[in-house]
Structures are given as C-alpha cells and as structure tokens.
A protein has these predicted regions:
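Structured beta->alpha junctions
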Residues: 20, 45-47, 75-77
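Short, aromatic-enriched amphipathic alpha-helices that serve as compact interaction elements
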Residues: 8-26, 34
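A short gly/proline-enriched turn/hairpin at secondary-structure junctions
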Residues: 3, 34, 39-50, 62-66
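A beta-strand edge to alpha-helix "cap/lid" segment located at domain peripheries
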Residues: 2-11, 27-30, 56, 60-145
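Hydrophobic alpha-helical segments and helix-packing faces
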Residues: 12, 24, 32, 48-55
C-alpha cells in the first residue's frame, strides 16, 4: 500500500472527482495527465487491454464509438491507494463497436449500462484501471442478443 500523501483516501476523493469530470468532458489530455506513464487500462468485459502510449488511442476509441457517453457514479469506495467505483453509463451507439471478433455497426440507439472500476493509484496517478461492465445488457439493448 502506498504511503504517499497524494494516495491517501482524503486526497484520492478529490483526485477521482477530477478524473471522473475529465471522462465526462471527454478531455483526453486531462485523463492521460492523471495516468502514470506505464498505466494499464484493462477492459475485462471486452477482453481488451492497453498500456503506456496505447491508452490514449484506446480511450479515444471509446469516445468515438459513444460520442456522448456520460458516467454517473452510483457508489464510491476510497481507501489509501485505491478507488473502486460503481457507475452507470448512458451513451448513443454512433460508430462501429468492436468486442473481440464481434463488429457492431452503429445502431443510433441510446442505451444505459452498469459497470465497476478498480483503480489503484501510485504517487497520485492512476496506475491501472480495471473495468468490468455489463456487456450482456449492452448487446441486448443494441439488438445483438
């Protein structure tokens, strides 16, 4: 567990609020600035992982597929060095979506789904982001299941 004051639970409450604001603003520069250089972004639901410089392109592809995506935090758990948050996303499927071998053409449907992030911090920066979301709900709402 980190002993850096920037990783204290009190500091991380402010940090995660700014991080979530950057995601909702689709501000890639602000998001990336809050990541450690060797940060890992793992979307376990989609079976995708990116690290280092790949993370910008990966997050950019999320904003491209879902250009109006917005997240609301349902529950937030913060302790020294770690944030776990449950969220609901609402977005319009405006561009191609890839999930492994599945390629879904844009449907124009606006849908909502739930997810959970596990975010360890190091030196005040996001060290990794493990994302778990309800892909069955996404695929059903898009008419793909």
């Amino acid at each position: 567990m980190s002993t850096d004051p920037k990783d204290s639970a009190a500091a991380l409450e402010d940090t995660i609020a700014r991080y979530n604001e950057a995601w909702n603003a689709h501000d890639l520069d602000a998001i990336i600035a809050m990541h450690a250089p060797d940060m890992v972004f793992a979307n376990h639901t989609a079976g995708e992982s990116a690290s280092g410089a790949e993370v910008r392109a990966h997050i950019g592809s999320i904003f491209e597929t879902w250009p109006d995506i917005a997240f609301s935090t349902r529950r937030l758990y913060v302790r020294d060095g770690l944030v776990v948050q449950e969220w609901t996303a609402t977005a319009t499927h405006a561009n191609e979506m890839r999930r492994g071998d599945l390629v879904a053409e844009p449907t124009g449907k606006t849908i909502s789904w739930n997810g959970l992030d596990v975010i360890p911090f190091e030196d005040g920066s996001v060290k990794r982001k493990d994302v778990y979301s309800d892909s069955v709900s996404i695929l059903r709402q898009l008419g793909l299941l």
